[in-house]
A protein has these predicted regions:
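Glycine/proline-enriched, intrinsically flexible loops and inter-domain linkers
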Residues: 1-230
């Protein structure tokens, strides 16, 4: 709101659509935001994405069944994009799922599809595969997420997390690291939805505003620009 966001209704959320400046129309705002993210750095509030915590000794097998791609060889600390289909073969939802531990995953879904995906997964567990040892918990509103993208995103992350090496060897694409910011636990995922070098920072929801302000402060020398989903 403080950054003059225009919102759209998505599922149960109001999500920043674009940020207008100086009487811009939507097209002009989107062009400015896109150019900033391409030339230097942009920041997106990705908190509205659905998040489902998946635990249990059969969690990997469960993912193998609900996604079109395989999950058995995904290493701990890695992320993978997954595509979920309906029983008629049509796309139902998609998102990135992260392997936190041997029997622990964090699935992300589309904002509007989060409740329906959770319901479908619970239905599968209760009616189709009751023998599987899997527990699902909706954690969408437990975490706030700031996504920083652009050619200067790595420099901004380095200012926020000076103890982490953000080179490709130590922090490759589609991986995550646990970290602390201001003494608060958080999780950094190197995931890109823009085609640019990007990182997502997940933190307990009550610290979301503080995280955003820290990111904006760290990125001010790089003209970090809030951008919406449009």
């Amino acid at each position: 709101v403080k950054n003059n966001a225009e919102f759209e209704n998505v599922g149960q959320w109001k999500r920043a659509w674009y940020y207008s400046r100086d009487n811009e129309n939507m097209h002009q705002s989107v062009q400015r935001e896109s150019k900033a993210a391409r030339d230097s750095a942009g920041i997106l509030d990705a908190s509205t994405l659905g998040k489902i915590d998946i635990k249990g000794s059969d969690a990997t097998e469960f993912l193998n069944r609900v996604y079109t791609n395989a999950w058995s060889k995904l290493s701990i600390g890695k992320c993978r994009y997954g595509l979920m289909l309906n029983e008629d073969g049509m796309v139902y939802d998609d998102g990135v799922t992260t392997r936190i531990d041997e029997n622990h995953y964090l699935m992300t879904t589309t904002t509007g599809g989060a409740a329906n995906v959770l319901s479908k997964l619970e239905d599968y567990l209760q009616t189709e595969w009751p023998e599987l040892d899997v527990w699902l918990t909706s954690v969408t509103d437990h975490y706030a997420t700031a996504s920083i993208c652009g050619p200067n995103s790595k420099k901004i992350l380095k200012k926020l997390f000076s103890d982490i090496e953000f080179n490709d060897q130590n922090f490759p694409h589609m991986s995550f690291k646990n970290a602390k910011i201001g003494g608060i636990d958080c999780r950094i995922m190197r995931i890109s939805f823009t085609g640019e070098h990007s990182y997502e920072i997940n933190i307990e929801a009550k610290y979301g505003n503080s995280l955003w302000e820290k990111c904006m402060d760290a990125g001010k020398d790089f003209n970090i620009t809030p951008y919406g989903t449009e």
